[in-house]
């Protein structure tokens, strides 16, 4: 085989593996198995074909270990010799790889080996079914050494993870030696997958992996954009010159490329979701739908939700407006190994006597019976996650998410996709007392199906990377958490104890009132195997800082949780500087903890370390853009520093997520007035009025009124006062219609119209102001007495400016009435005497007006 043909074949194998083209790989494997085949002279290539076949179609990935390639490269025949020094084994494997000539064939062999190890690790810990692994790979004593090697940014791998050696070997092949795989186009994508499942094996998100995944997925989505894939493809559809069979083949291949491009974006979106980069998910999801040509939306349809419902009501359902048809065979969309009937049995209905599993519709919705491609089902699951991310956790969000799940479960034909749909459905149902039991049983069924024979390992692996399906230990943890929710704390404790999740186990014991048993359990575990985590748990139980410090020292100052716990210990005792110091140490190791940044910011504000607080809350909102309280505190610091523009922007962001917080609206109002953003100030006043028991800040309202009266003066947005006149007039009208007994508001409203030249309106409003201030027994209090006189004086001044006989006459009668009512109590006061002079002036005015007539 000449070099050109060899290199072309290597590129093809690389492409077929990443797109799961089992038809092409199967055909190639059959050719390589024949006698006198063209691959006999290239044993490494033949082994690579075997590896590729096992990755996509083999009964067991372990079969790849029998190839000479893997035996030699990974020292499989002598693995047992390194049980006492696993570090030496990893070094030798790495040396074997780095010493290879960087030929395309050698690069492909390293890539496929890394994929084999990664898929094995994921199969064992995520998808199942159980695989028989050689005892040489089961290093019970040395697993601790491997777990330490897999620590990143102070975050540890789950202690009871199975066969972490496979994750480390995939890391050596796909991540550590990534630079030598430049001839393999898919190496970047597989590197991302290895990193992502390494991250998902850790207890918390890490900045190192966040940065790495964001950077490399940009390369992946560029390499695997649909335009790039179509350009690189040698065959393209040309219906004008092709036969029908060739045309169908071309359509199928183009659909495969669209699936591949869509999956690249889906996996990037799952990274965004994991690291809470929520602002990026919507855009990437829309791109994926565009590439896959999927157009779906929620709509309403009449139907029944309960078994005994006698009338039809509106149901929220999904309408598929456009999508590509599912292929007849070959792309994994119609895998015969997946038994549809068996999958339906895995959906727990619990024979609910009232609720239907799905709404029964009176007529079919567009796209209801369409067979969606696997990639489109993955996209719908992703859209469901986006609904949850974009909305608060309430009943409306649940109702909006359910149609996505129901659509996925209707016609799904992939084991992992169907399982993911069932899992999300159970998470939604757990909040309702009517469906909580069914939800718990459903998650338990998903745990029990690990060895379900209806789906092969290769089918599960093919879809796992494009879904958010949890690890087996996380799924069992979720079962235990649901048990607590329905009151079965003892059952939950048994699960947590078996999983060695001591934090959660202690919470169960506390929930059951067994506090002494909690401490006893931790001390027992410390005697068996001391760990930083257990010392932190003991510190929580005893409220003693020395245990956090001991855990920190035991971890060689790498376990950031110890410093976070220590910081909260100091925060509770108002030792703010010590709290700040501890948080800064913890966050220097792993800064992806928004709650810790928030607490650090609060502590810094307490001792007026404004720069520290500003940095802390800036980090909070960058990690959690929907954290309204973080935006509010950030704005408070800006306001303290008199940076009103920045404060206003921060509050505007925060109010997107905390619209019911009237205090934030009040701060926003102050900022808007300070920067002369009167349009938003009006919005703020309306919200404060609605949320805070009809409270109105008249001083700030008068500033807005002054702007309108100024006519030509522009505000921050370039809006003149005259253009805001209608808006502000409507604001006054709304406020006074709901707050009728506030004389100061009526007076301000009157003054506003007076200055605009609306005299009759001003007089009418001032009359209402006068009436509203004359409460019962007003003459008995000096303050109310003076206010009544002041308001009526203002009304008379309006009459004097625009006199007519009837107004002056009614004013004279009103003043006489007030003077008579107050004579006994306030006759000797200056206000009373001035009011008497007002009566004289009214009499004179009346005489003058009568003479003119």
Swiss-Prot record:
It comes from the Eukaryota. TPR repeats lie at residues 486-519, 525-558, 560-593, 594-627, 629-661, 662-695. SUPFAM superfamilies: TPR-like (SSF48452). InterPro entries: TPR-like_helical_dom_sf, TPR_rpt, TTC27/Emw1. Keywords: Repeat, TPR repeat. The keyword Ligase does not apply. Residues 324-345 are annotated as: Disordered. Pfam families: TPR_16 (PF13432). Residues 332-342 have a biased composition (Polar residues). The keyword Repeat applies. Belongs to the TTC27 family. PANTHER family: TETRATRICOPEPTIDE REPEAT PROTEIN 27 (PTHR16193:SF0). This is Tetratricopeptide repeat protein 27 homolog. It comes from Dictyostelium discoideum. The gene is ttc27.
């Amino acid at each position: 085989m000449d070099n050109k043909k060899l290199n072309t074949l290597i590129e093809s194998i690389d492409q077929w593996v990443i797109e799961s083209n089992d038809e092409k790989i199967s055909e190639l494997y059959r050719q390589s198995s024949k006698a006198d085949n063209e691959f006999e002279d290239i044993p490494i290539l033949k082994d690579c074909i075997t590896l590729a076949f096992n990755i996509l179609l083999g009964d067991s990935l372990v079969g790849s270990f029998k190839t000479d390639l893997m035996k030699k490269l990974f020292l499989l025949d002598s693995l047992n010799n390194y049980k006492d020094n696993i570090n030496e084994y990893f070094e030798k494997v790495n040396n074997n790889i780095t010493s290879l000539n960087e030929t395309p064939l050698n690069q492909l062999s390293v890539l496929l080996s890394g994929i084999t190890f990664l898929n094995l690790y994921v199969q064992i810990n995520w998808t199942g079914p159980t695989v028989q692994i050689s005892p040489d790979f089961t290093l019970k004593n040395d697993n601790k050494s491997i777990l330490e090697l897999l620590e990143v940014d102070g975050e540890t791998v789950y202690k009871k993870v199975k066969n972490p050696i496979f994750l480390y070997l995939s890391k050596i092949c796909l991540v550590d030696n990534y630079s030598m795989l430049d001839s393999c186009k898919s190496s970047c994508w597989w590197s991302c997958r290895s990193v992502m499942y390494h991250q998902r094996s850790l207890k918390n998100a890490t900045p190192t992996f966040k940065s790495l995944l964001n950077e490399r997925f940009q390369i992946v989505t560029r390499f695997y954009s649909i335009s790039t894939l179509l350009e690189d493809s040698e065959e393209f559809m040309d219906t004008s010159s092709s036969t029908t069979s060739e045309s169908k083949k071309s359509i199928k291949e183009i659909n495969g490329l669209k699936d591949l491009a869509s999956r690249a974006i889906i996996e990037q979106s799952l990274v965004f979701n994991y690291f809470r980069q929520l602002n990026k998910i919507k855009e990437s999801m829309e791109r994926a739908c565009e590439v896959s040509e999927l157009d779906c939306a929620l709509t309403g349809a009449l139907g029944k939700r309960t078994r005994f419902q006698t009338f039809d009501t509106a149901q929220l359902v999904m309408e598929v407006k456009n999508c590509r048809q599912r292929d007849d065979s070959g792309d994994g969309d119609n895998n015969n190994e997946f038994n549809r009937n068996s999958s339906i049995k895995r959906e727990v209905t619990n024979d609910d006597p009232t609720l239907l599993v799905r709404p029964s519709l009176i007529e079919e919705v567009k796209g209801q019976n369409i067979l969606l491609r696997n990639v489109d089902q993955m996209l719908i699951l992703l859209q469901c996650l986006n609904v949850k991310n974009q909305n608060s956790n309430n009943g409306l969000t649940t109702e909006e998410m359910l149609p996505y799940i129901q659509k996925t479960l209707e016609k799904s034909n992939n084991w992992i996709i169907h399982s993911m749909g069932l899992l999300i459905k159970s998470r939604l149902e757990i909040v309702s007392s009517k469906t909580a039991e069914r939800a718990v049983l459903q998650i338990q069924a998903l745990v029990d199906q690990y060895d379900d024979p209806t789906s092969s390992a290769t089918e599960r692996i093919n879809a796992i990377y494009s879904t958010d399906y949890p690890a087996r230990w996380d799924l069992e943890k979720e079962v235990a958490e649901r048990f607590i929710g329905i009151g079965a704390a003892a059952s939950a404790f048994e699960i947590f104890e078996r999983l060695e999740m001591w934090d959660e186990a202690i919470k169960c014991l506390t929930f059951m009132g067994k506090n002494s048993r909690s401490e006893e359990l931790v001390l027992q575990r410390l005697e068996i195997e001391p760990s930083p985590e257990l010392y932190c748990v003991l510190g929580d139980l005893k409220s003693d800082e020395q245990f956090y410090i001991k855990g920190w020292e035991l971890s060689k100052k790498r376990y950031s949780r110890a410093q976070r716990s220590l910081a909260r210990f100091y925060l509770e005792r108002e030792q703010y500087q010590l709290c700040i110091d501890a948080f800064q140490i913890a966050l220097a190791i792993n800064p992806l903890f928004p709650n810790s940044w928030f607490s650090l910011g609060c502590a810094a504000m307490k001792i007026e370390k404004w720069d520290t607080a500003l940095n802390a809350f800036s980090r909070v909102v960058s990690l959690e853009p929907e954290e309204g309280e973080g935006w509010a505190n950030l704005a408070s610091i800006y306001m303290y520093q008199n940076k009103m523009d920045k404060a206003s922007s921060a509050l505007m962001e925060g109010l997107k997520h905390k619209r019911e917080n009237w205090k934030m609206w009040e701060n926003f109002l102050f900022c808007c007035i300070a920067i002369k953003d009167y349009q938003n100030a009006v919005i703020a006043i309306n919200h404060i009025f609605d949320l805070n028991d009809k409270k109105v800040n008249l001083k700030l309202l008068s500033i807005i009124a002054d702007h309108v009266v100024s006519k030509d003066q522009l505000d921050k947005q370039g809006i003149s006062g005259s253009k805001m006149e209608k808006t502000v007039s409507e604001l006054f009208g709304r406020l006074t219609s709901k707050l009728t007994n506030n004389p100061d508001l009526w007076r301000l409203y009157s003054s506003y119209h007076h200055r605009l030249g609306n005299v009759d309106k001003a007089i009418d409003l001032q009359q209402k102001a006068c009436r509203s201030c004359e409460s019962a027994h007003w003459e008995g209090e000096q303050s109310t007495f003076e206010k009544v006189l002041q308001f009526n004086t203002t009304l008379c001044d309006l009459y004097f400016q625009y006199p007519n006989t009837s107004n002056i006459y009614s004013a004279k009668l009103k003043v006489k009435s007030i003077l008579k009512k107050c004579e006994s109590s306030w006759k000797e006061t200056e206000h009373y005497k001035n009011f008497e002079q007002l009566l004289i002036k009214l009499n004179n005015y009346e005489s003058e007006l009568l003479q003119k007539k």
